[in-house]
Amino acid sequence: MREVVIASAARTAVGSFGGAFKSVSAVELGVTAAKEAIKRANITPDMIDESLLGGVLTAGLGQNIARQIALGAGIPVEKPAMTINIVCGSGLRSWRALRTRTGPRRR
């Protein structure tokens, strides 16, 4: 089995719907967070094999915002990306999808 790691994570600032970030698209916010996660991990974008994103309210942003964000963060076009949108559980489902692919954590 291939070893899989989560090297880093970052999130955007928290705001209210229609608030300070209303003119910034979710894709732009995601690119900022992805670039920061890559920077914190001290890796290069080409080292990332796959991107998963849990997102909500993605209508009007185009297809597969995970892919748009990955490309915006410099991850090569050859690397796959998947958006999961099931409202509040999106982040958890993203984690579950990753765990299903990699198997249970070993101690």
Curated annotation (Swiss-Prot):
Q: Does the keyword Protease apply?
A: no
Q: In which domain of life is the source organism classified?
A: Bacteria
Q: Which GO terms describe its molecular function?
A: acetyl-CoA C-acetyltransferase activity
Query: Pfam families, per this entry?
Result: Thiolase_N
Q: Catalysed reaction per UniProt?
A: 2 acetyl-CoA = acetoacetyl-CoA + CoA
Q: Catalytic residues?
A: C88
Keywords from the UniProt entry: Acyltransferase, Cytoplasm, Transferase
For this protein, the record's SUPFAM superfamilies field holds: Thiolase-like
Please give the InterPro entries that the UniProt record associates with this protein.
Thiolase-like (IPR016039), Thiolase_N (IPR020616)
> Quaternary state and partners of this protein?
Homotetramer.
Q: What does this protein do?
A: Catalyzes the condensation of two molecules of acetyl-CoA to produce acetoacetyl-CoA.
Q: Which family does it belong to?
A: Belongs to the thiolase-like superfamily. Thiolase family.
Report what the protein is called: Acetyl-CoA acetyltransferase
